[in-house]
Amino acid sequence: MTERPALIRKWACIMTVFLFCFVLATRGRAQNQAGSISGTLMDSAGSVLKGAQVSIPAKGLNVSTDEQGRFFFSGLQPGNYTISVSYIGFENLTKTVIVNPGESTAVSLQLQVGSEKQSVLVTAGSASAEVEAVNEERTADNLIQVMPTQTITSLPDRNLGDAISRMASVALTRNEGQANFVALRGGEPRLTNTTVDGFNMPSQDPGIREFDFFSVPPGIVGSVTVSKTLSANKDGDGIGGSIDLVTKTASDTPTYQITAMGGISAMGGFTPIENARPNADIYGTWGRRFGASKKLGFVVGAQYSFDGTGYNDVEPTPDEATLANNQSVPWDDAQDLRTYMFHRPRYGVGGSLDYRIKPGSTIFLRYFYSFTRDSGDKSVYTLFDNTPGAQVINPGNTGCSGTDATTGATAPPCNTPPRYYNQAEDARIYSDSIQLSGTHVLNNTWYSWSAAIGAGYFGDNPFESGNFTNTASTTACQFNQAATKDYYVPQWTPACFSEINSPQNYFFTGTQREPGHEEQINLGLEGSGAFRWHLGGHLSTFEYGGKFRGMHKYNNQYKSNETYAGAGAGIPMTTFRNNLVQPNYYNGAYKDGYNVWFGPVQEYVDQHPTEFTLDNSDKGVDSSNYSLVEHIPAGYVMNTTDFSNGIRLVLGLRAEVTSVNVHNLAFDPNGNATPNKFSGSYYDLLPSASLRFNAGHDSYMRLIYARGVSRPEESELASDVNWGTGGNGAYKNTVSFGNPNLKAETGDDVDVLYEHYFKTFGVFSGGYFFKHLASPPVQTNTVLNNYLPPGAPSIDQGTYLATNYINAGSAWISGVELQYLQHWTNLPGFLSGLGMNANYSYIGSQTSGIAGRSDKPRLLENAPNLFNIGPTYNKGPLSMQMNINYNGSSIYYYQYTDGAPGGPTGPLGDNYNYPHTQVDAQGSYALPRGFKVLVSGLNLTNEEFGFYYGSPKFDTQREFYHPTYSFGLSWTPQHEK
C-alpha cells in the first residue's frame, strides 16, 4: 500500500519542476521585450523548401527550415538583422530585416535556382525531392538519409520496405515476394528501430520487436528519414540505425494529387500461373490551410493497392551422398512442390492536423494507419526419396524407415509415398498511431512535448491447414541423381508424379486452425526544452528532456483441430475438384499434382459437423500465450556549440531504465499448465558526441561516436516454462524458459564521413563506420542446482539442465559506405536531363559465443556487398527513373556446429539467403492541366528468392515472382510538385 503514495509523490515532484521551469520561462519573456523573426522559404514555383540553412551571421544563430518551409529566430534585441539563406541547387540569399520591441517580424523569402540549366530540378518531382533530401541531410547533426514521398513513388514498390532498400547500406528480409524487415549497416533487423514522427512503432509480428513493413503502402508518408547514428535526444534503440516515418504536413499552398495504376504480373520464366495476375494501385494527397492567417492546416495521404501474386516454389531437403565409387554428390532426401496464389489488399492513411498559435508555437495532431490482409492459398506435395543403399550424412529425412542413423546407409522398408496438405493464409496485419505534440519557442528558450499511442496487430485465422493421408501401400518414388544436371532443378523418377496425380489414393482427414491474435500496444509521453548560452564567447544550446515509454504485448492464439471421426480413412480427395491445373509447372521441370484449396475442405467440415471431432482444449493454455509489460523511463542532456570556421560540436548523455514484467505458463511433463510470472530490470547510460567542420570549399567532415541498445525479443523474455523429469544421460531433469533478466545488447559506433557538394547539383560522400556489440542474447545450456519448476511438487526439486537465453559473447561490424548523386545539367542539349543516384557498401562482421561452435561467423543478415545504381532522366515533360538493387548473400539463421558432417559448406551448414539483384523502372510524361501518364516495371529481372545450406548446391528453396507491368494516370495541379 506504500507504493501508490510514493508514486504520487514522485510524479508530483516532476510536475512541480516542469511548472517551475515554465513559470521562469514565461516570466523572463514578460520582462524582456525582445523581438523575433518568423519566415517561410519557397522556390520560384511557390513550393516550400525544407531543410534550408538560415542564419543571422552577426549573432551566430543557425536554424533549418521545417517540413513547412518555416523558420523562427527568437530573443532578438530591437534593430536591423541580416538573414542569410543557403540551399544547395539555388542561389544564396541575404535580406535585411527590422526587428521591433516585443514584436515578431514576418518575412517571406523566395530562392532562385543556381542557373537556368538547373531549373529542371524544380520542375521534375523526383529531382526536386532529391534537392530537398540533400539539403536536409546537410544540415543535420547526425548522419541521416532522407527519402521524400516524391522519391518513394518515383519507382514501383509493393510496400514501403522496397523503397527504403534503395538507400545506402540497407538490406531486406523478404518473405513470399514481399519486403518484411529492414536491416541497416550489416546488423540484423532486430538492431533496427522504427518510429513514426519519433514515436516507437509497435511490432505487428508474434514474439519479436521488429516493425514489419509488409503492411505499409509506400505513398502514405511524407518522407522517410534513416538515422545511421544516434544522438542523446533520440531513443537509444537502434544499434544498426533508426527509421523514422514522417507523416505529411500541410503547406501554405493547397495540395491535391492523385495517381491510379493498374496492370498485370506476367508469369514468364519459371512460374507460368494462369498466364497473368492482376494488380492495382491508387494513392493521393489532399491538404490545405484555412483562414486568412492560415493558422489551421490539414493534410491526408491515402493509398489502396491490390497485389495478385502467384508462383511455384520448389523446396528440396538437401543432403550429401557417397556413391559406390566413393564419389560424394549432392542428394535430396525429400522435396516440396508448392503453389501459392495470393490476393492481398493493402491500404493506409497518414497525415496531420496542425494549428499555429503564433510564430514559433505550433500544435500537431498526427495520425498513421496501415492494413494488409495477407490472404491466399497454398497447395503442397512432398516427395520422399525411397532409394535403398544410399550413404547419406543426414539420414533422418529419407523415405527409408530402416535407415541406420549412425552409418547413414538407407535401408528398407523404403515405402513413404508422397504427402499432401493445403493451407489458407488469412492474417489481418495492421499498425497505427496517433500523436499530439507541440513546439513552443520563447525568447532564449524553447520547449516541446508529445503524447502518443499506437498498436500493432497480427492474427484472426492466420494459418488454416487441411490434412490428407496417402493410403497407397507401395511407392516407387525416388530422387534421380543421375538425371539431375542442374542442382537448382533436382530430378525425381516418373513414379513420383504419377503418384501425386492419383487423387484416389488421398483422403482428407481434418483441419488445423490457429484462431486468436498477437497485439502490441505502445504508449509514449515526452517533454524537452533548451536554452541558449555562451561557452567562452561561442553560442551554445543546452537541451534537456525526459520520456516515458510503455509497452504491452500479449498472445491469445490457440489450436483448433477438427479430425475426421467417420468410417474409412477419410473423405476421398476426388470429392473436391482440382482447383488449379498447371501444365507447365516450374517452367516444365515437373508435372504438377491434383490441387485442392483449403476453402472447399473447410466448407465440407462446416456442412458435415457430425463426421469430425473438435479439439480446442488448449484455448487459454497454449504454449504461445504470454503477456509482457515493459516500462522505459529516460532522460537526457545535450549541448551544441558553434565555433568559428564552421566547427560544430555536439555532446550528449542519455540514461534509460528498463523494467519487464512477464506472465506466461509453465507446463509439466504431462502437458498440464500452471500460471507463472516473473520480472527483471536494468539501466543503460548512452553517451554520444558529434564533430562537424569545413574541409574545403563546399566540403565537410563529420566525426561521430554514439552508443545504442537493442532490447531482447519478447520470445526470449517470455517463452513458456517447459520441464520434464524423465530424461536419459547425465541430466534426468530438463527445463526451458524465457529469461526476464536478459539485458539490452549494447553497441558502440564510430563514424567518419567526408561529403562534397558539386556546383551543378550533386553530392559525393564517403565514410567508414565501426560498431562493437557487447552481450547479445545467446541461447545456451546451464545447470541449475536445487531448482523447482513453477507449479511442480517439492519432490521434483533438484538439478536441472536449463535451456534459455543469456547475455554472452560479442560481435563487431565494420563497413565502408559510398554515395554519389548528381544531375548533369551542364551537359549540352538533351543530355542535360541525365542524372545518377548510386551507392555502394562493403560491410564485414564477426560474432562469437554461439553454442556448439568455435568459429566466428558473420552476423545474421549481414550481406557484405550492397549497391544501388539509379540512372535518371528529367527534361521537359519526360521523367524516367531506373534502379538496380543488389543484396549479397547473407546468413539467415545459424545451423552449423563443430564437427558436423560435410563441414560449414555442407548440407548441415548455416542457412543462407541467395544474393538478390532486382531491376525496377518507371517513366512519366507530363500532359496539359497537370496530368501525367505513367508506366512502370517491377522486378524486370524476375529475380530469384530462396535459401541454401552451406553452399548454393545445397539448395533448400528457390522461387520466382515474375515482372509486374503497370500503367496509370496521375493528376497534380501545376503549382504543386
Placement of each model-derived feature along the sequence:
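Short loop/turn motifs that connect adjacent beta-strands in outer-membrane beta-barrel proteins
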Residues: 250-255, 290-296, 359-360, 439, ...
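Periplasm-facing N-terminal accessory domains of Gram-negative outer-membrane beta-barrel systems
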Residues: 13, 17-20, 24-130, 140
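Gram-negative outer-membrane beta-barrel transporters
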Residues: 769-773, 777, 784, 788-896
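A beta-strand signature from Gram-negative outer-membrane beta-barrel systems
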Residues: 167-168, 203, 208, 215-259, ...
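C-terminal beta-signal and adjacent terminal beta-strands/loops
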Residues: 566, 886-900, 913, 924-977
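Outer-membrane beta-barrel signature, preferentially recognizing the C-terminal barrel domain
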Residues: 416-433, 620, 624-632, 680, ...
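Periplasmic N-terminal accessory/gating domains of Gram-negative outer-membrane beta-barrel systems
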Residues: 91, 98-107, 119-183, 188-190, ...
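Transmembrane beta-barrel wall of Gram-negative outer-membrane proteins
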Residues: 274-387, 401, 419, 426-436, ...
